[in-house]
């Protein structure tokens, strides 16, 4: 079947965290998305803070707010699975530009 969507696709998203709100992932049409793992690493020489949001239909829900991450440490902002429906987003913002990196693994399953 040409052009058929794979049944299960694993994806990893990695972005630099900035002071502006950034969308790390948006759940696409035609799949069910499940958050498997995420981590925010502080690559700076000082303490940084991060806020991670789940955005559903334009409404933000803070998953973790102003969490302090010591220098060269890592925070797992979303513990466990999180089901993302079409258009749902994971958004992130930090206390300084390029002081942290966010990595997230997602399983997309064809509907």
Descriptions of predicted regions:
Residues 67-74:
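Short proline/glycine- and polar residue-rich coil/turn motifs
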Residues 33-42, 89-92:
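A short beta-strand element within beta-rich, extracytoplasmic domains
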Residues 74-81:
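Exposed aromatic-hydrophobic patches
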Residues 82-96:
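Noncatalytic modules at the cell exterior or secretory-pathway interfaces
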Residues 45-66:
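Short, surface-exposed beta-strand/strand-loop-strand elements in extracellular ectodomains
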Residues 31, 73, 86-88:
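Surface-exposed loop/turn positions
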Residues 1-34, 94-111:
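C-terminal interaction-tip segments
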Residues 43-44, 96:
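Short, acidic/polar linear motifs in exposed loop/turn regions
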């Amino acid at each position: 079947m040409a052009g058929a969507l794979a049944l299960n696709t694993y994806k990893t998203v990695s972005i630099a965290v900035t002071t502006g709100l950034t969308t790390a992932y948006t759940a696409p049409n035609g799949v069910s998305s499940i958050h498997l793992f995420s981590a925010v690493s502080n690559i700076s020489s000082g303490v940084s803070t991060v806020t991670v949001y789940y955005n559903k239909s334009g409404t933000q829900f803070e998953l973790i707010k102003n969490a302090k991450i010591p220098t060269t440490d890592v925070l797992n902002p979303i513990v466990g699975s999180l089901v993302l429906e079409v258009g749902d987003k994971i958004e992130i913002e930090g206390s300084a530009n390029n002081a942290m990196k966010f990595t997230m693994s997602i399983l997309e399953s064809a509907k």
